[in-house]
């Protein structure tokens, strides 16, 4: 007969890893909009836009975003260890799988926007001509890449919502502790249509949600009754 019980030290180790990964991921999602230059807003095919794309801040900000997504996927895997053997076991697996698929679909767009636009902008500034910046629209707005990007972000949001449901049903974490992070990722697509301050505020929401969940994961494990 297979032993399906989960050793306390295994759950504690998973909780510590998940807390660290969620915490760092949340901070990276805050740095992403905070460091990003915004001179390209309403000026994406002008030299003002090129100055944003060519800056070190542009590259760093998008790298922060990409690392945030990777760490989010790893955090979901570690959270699954915490939920193993609870009523939310299968839901935790679903959250991990959906999140990773979403991350996989999202990252190619971030890579293109980061490195391709950076290279195009450096060349445009060197030539003193904005003509090359017509490529910005092609890099950003093609049907295939936009579909992958939007689908990826929707799946990441679905993964975060599924994780919140798993946490609610698990009995080992405070029921509400996954909801703020789920709300943050549900707002990931809409925040792109807001002004810079909205994007920075969204980063604050994501960081707060991730740190809240991290703090809950570091609390001593409780039984189902106490976790409510």
Which stretches of residues belong to each language-model region?
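Hydrophobic, aromatic-enriched alpha-helical segments typical of multi-pass transmembrane helices
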Residues: 2-228
């Amino acid at each position: 007969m297979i032993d399906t019980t989960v050793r306390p030290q295994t759950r504690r180790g998973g909780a510590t890893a998940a807390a660290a990964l969620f915490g760092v991921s949340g901070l990276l999602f805050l740095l992403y909009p905070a460091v990003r230059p915004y001179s390209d807003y309403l000026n994406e095919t002008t030299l003002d836009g090129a100055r944003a794309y060519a800056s070190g801040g542009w590259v760093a900000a998008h790298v922060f975003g990409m690392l945030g997504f990777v760490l989010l996927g790893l955090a979901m895997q570690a959270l699954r260890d915490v939920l193993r053997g609870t009523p939310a076991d299968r839901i935790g697996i679903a959250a991990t799988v959906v999140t990773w698929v979403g991350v996989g679909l999202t990252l190619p767009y971030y890579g293109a926007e980061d490195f391709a636009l950076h290279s195009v902008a450096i060349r445009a500034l060197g030539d003193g001509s904005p003509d090359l910046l017509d490529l910005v629209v092609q890099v950003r707005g093609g049907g295939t890449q936009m579909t992958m990007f939007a689908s990826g972000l929707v799946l990441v949001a679905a993964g975060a919502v599924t994780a919140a449901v798993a946490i609610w049903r698990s009995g080992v974490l405070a029921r509400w502790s996954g909801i703020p992070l789920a709300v943050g990722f549900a707002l990931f697509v809409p925040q792109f249509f807001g002004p810079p301050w909205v994007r920075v505020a969204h980063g604050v929401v994501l960081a707060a949600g991730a740190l809240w969940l991290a703090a809950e994961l570091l609390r001593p494990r409780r039984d189902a009754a106490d976790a409510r």
